[in-house]
């Protein structure tokens, strides 16, 4: 949570320019430096370090932050299996679940750090790792209708897909809301970094199937096939991730399509800004009603800090768009 807290503080500083907020952010950020100095233990290195140190470097240009990012990117890349073509997400699940090489959709979020490192003094190989991971995931981790599996399990000898399953979703055959959100955000970033039109096309396909199935207020149920709909819990974190992604994606597309995505993002934010999803003074968080891990009975209908992070990011992106600025600062 130190990473997400650091990230939220930095986003608040970005809006307020209050130096006290930046100092609080630095305290949380510095507590994560050790992650750049130890062997990679799972895929979350990218999210933990790039959101904290990446935003920190963007705002301060502190060279110490840059070194941490570059070292962590090298560490993350050690999880890459060239036979499979993706990074291993959860080494801890290899033996207990008999998942020889597992890649989760969340891992798409970590590619941004690899792209950044490759063009900011890191090993150019990191770019190739990110592209390979995106390509293999695109080929193997989606159904014909462009809904995603949470987990792809691969054979380490042949590199072939063994099966697609869920871990945090309702069932292997269903669309877990935040997993699809990671895909939308991830492929938007891959297009930004490569300018390869196949990723732009794919980002739209995974977005459209998500948008088509949303309830009226544009905040998804935690899984699109969750039991108990319409009374099933919503996932505000997924809505925040998608809103932020669509504000960027909209800028890469012609007016009609781009406006449709931008308008959808604005509707999502309008719902998240409403009393139905705002915590007010009841909690230290901004947003209520996220779901972390339903099958594990963890963080159900809860406030989750990364929901706040992407919510604030989306609000800042919308502000920049309204001011006629580049959505990516």
Question: Residue ranges of each PLM-predicted region?
Answer:
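Aromatic- and glycine-enriched pocket-lining scaffold segments that form the walls
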Residues: 86-151
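Structural helix-adjacent loops and short alpha-helical linkers that scaffold large soluble proteins
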Residues: 12-26, 57-70, 118-131, 191-204, ...
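Long, well-ordered core segments of solenoidal/helical folds
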Residues: 20-40, 69-89, 129-149, 155-166, ...
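Single conserved hydrophobic/aromatic residue that forms the stacking wall/gate
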Residues: 1-5, 9
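CBM-like carbohydrate-recognition segments
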Residues: 64-67, 231-329
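Aromatic- and histidine-enriched alpha-helix N-cap/loop-to-helix transition segments
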Residues: 6-7, 20, 40-51, 102-112, ...
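Oxyanion-binding "anion nests"
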Residues: 179-215
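Carbohydrate-binding/catalytic loop surfaces
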Residues: 47-62, 88-105, 146-175, 218-241, ...
């Amino acid at each position: 949570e130190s990473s997400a807290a650091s990230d939220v503080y930095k986003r608040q500083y970005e809006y307020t320019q209050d130096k006290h907020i930046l100092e609080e952010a630095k305290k949380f950020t510095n507590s994560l430096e050790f992650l750049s100095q130890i062997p990679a233990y799972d895929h979350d290195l990218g999210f933990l370090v790039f959101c904290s140190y990446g935003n920190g470097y963007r705002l301060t240009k502190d060279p110490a932050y840059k070194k941490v990012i570059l070292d962590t990117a090298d560490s993350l890349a050690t999880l890459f299996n060239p036979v499979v073509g993706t990074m291993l997400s959860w080494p801890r699940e290899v033996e207990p679940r008999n998942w020889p090489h597992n890649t989760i959709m969340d891992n798409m979020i970590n590619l941004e750090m690899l792209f950044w490192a490759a063009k900011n003094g890191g090993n150019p190989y990191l770019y190739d790792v990110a592209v390979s991971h995106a390509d293999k995931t695109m080929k193997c981790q989606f159904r014909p209708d462009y809904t995603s599996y949470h987990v792809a399990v691969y054979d380490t000898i042949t590199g072939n897909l063994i099966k697609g399953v869920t871990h945090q979703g309702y069932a292997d055959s269903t669309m877990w809301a935040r997993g699809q959100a990671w895909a939308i955000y991830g492929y938007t970033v891959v297009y930004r970094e490569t300018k390869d039109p196949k990723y732009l096309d794919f980002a739209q396909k995974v977005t459209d199937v998500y948008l088509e199935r949303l309830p009226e207020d544009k905040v998804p149920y935690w899984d699109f096939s969750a039991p108990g709909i319409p009374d099933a819990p919503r996932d505000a974190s997924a809505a925040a991730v998608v809103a932020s992604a669509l504000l960027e994606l909209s800028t890469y597309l012609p007016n009609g399509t781009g406006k449709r995505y931008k308008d959808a993002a604005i509707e999502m934010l309008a719902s998240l800004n409403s009393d139905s999803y705002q915590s007010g003074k009841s909690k230290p968080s901004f947003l209520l009603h996220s779901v972390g891990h339903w099958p594990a009975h963890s963080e159900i209908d809860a406030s989750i800090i990364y929901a706040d992070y992407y919510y604030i990011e989306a609000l800042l992106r919308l502000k920049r768009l309204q001011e006629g600025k580049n959505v990516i600062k």
